[in-house]
Amino acid sequence: MISFKYIGKHGRLGNQMFQFAATVGIARKINKGFVFPKENTEIPSVEDFKDGVTREVYFDLPKYFPNVTMTLAPLDQIETNHVAQEPGFHFFPEFFAIPDQTNLMGYFQTEKYFEHCSDLILGFFQFDREIKKKAENALPKIPGNPELVSVHVRVGDYKALQQFHPVMDADYYFSAMMEFSDKDHNTDKYFVIFSDDIEYAKNLFGESEGIIYMENNEPEVDMCAMSMCHHNIIAN
């Protein structure tokens, strides 16, 4: 059995999705099972950064993706005799040779750890029905079925973490948007703006026919709505 005992203690939803997917992918590659601690969904942890910056984190995945709950077990029932620490932010194929009963540690931010079982991962990452319904209702209904490009402008928590997660500047967003605008002139495109600081985003992009702002949604609804767009411009 392969586990990630610290999931929910190092990183929020996006990081947890990579950590979960990598654990499943590595376990499947070596023909082992996988399991995650139930307690991490109930007890908050404090994530520490340099310079005294902290933030509270939970293991959020089961709350948004109900299928993840079938992978949970009490911590005292998860036996691990080995630890495999990710040495860096690149792909390390050596993880496909770890022994059974290994506890993984790291961020594992590459699909190479789980691309061989992508259908299984997508099965786990099916949003809760209520979240899906809210996302579908929140997305604009535009005649002619144009392509929707989500634009994620993340500002809030990154302001205090600039040395780790720089806020992307206007040049990044406008350059990315131009890539889509120039690619196919025969298809109408609308840019759907998602942000944790919508006033900042409005000052950045202004008002125009091709810009739509998503407001007053929970973060998980925004994420689900982003997944329903045809293309995505991410924040980091």
What are these regions (language model features)?
Residues 44-188:
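Secretory-pathway luminal glycosyltransferase catalytic domains
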Residues 41-46, 159, 197-203:
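Short, charged/polar "capping" segments at the starts of alpha-helices
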Residues 16-28, 174-181:
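Histidine-anchored nucleotide/phosphate-binding helix
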Residues 13, 182-236:
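Donor-binding and catalytic core of enzymes assembling or modifying cell-surface/extracellular glycoconjugates
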Residues 1-5:
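Extracellular/lumenal mucin-like low-complexity stalks
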Residues 8-18:
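A short, glycine/small-residue-rich beta-strand->loop->alpha-helix junction that serves as a flexible
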Residues 32-43:
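A short beta-strand-loop structural module common to alpha/beta enzyme folds
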